[in-house]
Regions:
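Substrate/ligand-engaging "lid" and interaction regions
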Residues: 197
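Glycine-rich phosphate/dinucleotide-binding loop and adjoining beta-alpha-beta core of small-molecule
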Residues: 201
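Hydrophobic alpha-helical transmembrane segments
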Residues: 1-191, 204-236
Length: 236
């Protein structure tokens, strides 16, 4: 009973510290893709890995390609969660109690922080809102990372709509869902969610290129976001 209480308290502390760390440090901006902090961010690594291996899961037969799409998704998820699970298990198992809590907690805070995005997105939203208010459309389009829409032909009002739409979606993808995944499945769960969400962003499209290899990733993302989406809709 006492151990469960300690674990619950540790999880709460990790969540709070991860949020505070994000609010202080934020995330590396996509506007500077050559910086090493951007290149080594887990989401960026997941995206590049997915892009590089997807061609190996292509097949002329649609059914086979859908099956390979399952393998693609599982490959990415397992590749990024296995080292985390094994590493944290080793820390928890082989390092003496109390010391292992500190080490586990420190690493967990950093990893959970990397699955959420609050400061960077908030800064973007404020900057985009200011640019829209000033009718500075070129400046607004610098923040087109916000939306999956093609920003080239959007006017100020449409860009504003895109920002609001993306803020609502990212409330789920970069805040509520990763934190819920951590609360239920631990650090590995949060990393797994980030991998699933990244897969959806890379291949989860109904285009000729991705409709088969990405169907599993898209549906898996819908599944893991089912409850967070409903909770968010109640809040909004």
């Amino acid at each position: 009973m006492e151990l469960n209480l300690i674990n619950a308290l540790v999880a709460i502390v990790i969540t709070v510290l991860a949020i505070l760390l994000d609010l202080v440090l934020g995330d590396p901006s996509p506007n500077y893709p050559d910086k090493w902090v951007f290149k080594l961010h887990p989401t960026v690594l997941m995206g590049k890995f997915t892009k590089n291996i997807e061609p190996f899961f292509k097949n002329a037969d649609a059914k086979m390609e859908k099956f390979l799409g399952i393998l693609l998704g599982l490959t990415v998820i397992v590749t990024f969660t296995s080292p985390i699970f094994i590493g944290l298990w080793a820390i928890y198992t082989f390092i003496p109690f109390c010391i292992n809590l500190v080490v586990y907690g420190f690493i967990s805070v950093i990893l959970v922080k990397m699955t959420i995005c609050i400061k960077l997105e908030t800064d973007w939203a404020k900057a985009a809102a200011k640019a829209i208010d000033e009718s500075n459309l070129p400046e607004v389009k610098k923040y087109s990372h916000f939306s999956r829409r093609e920003s080239k032909d959007l006017n100020g009002v449409q860009m504003g709509s895109a920002v609001i739409e993306s803020m609502s979606e990212n409330l789920i993808d970069f805040k509520l869902s990763p934190m819920m995944s951590f609360a239920i499945f631990g650090v590995t769960g949060a990393i797994a969610f980030r991998a699933i969400n990244t897969l959806d962003g890379m291949v989860g499209f109904k285009t000729k290129e991705h409709i088969n290899t990405g169907w599993f990733s898209a549906n898996l993302d819908n599944f893991v976001n089912f409850i967070p989406t409903r909770l968010t809709s109640l809040r909004l």
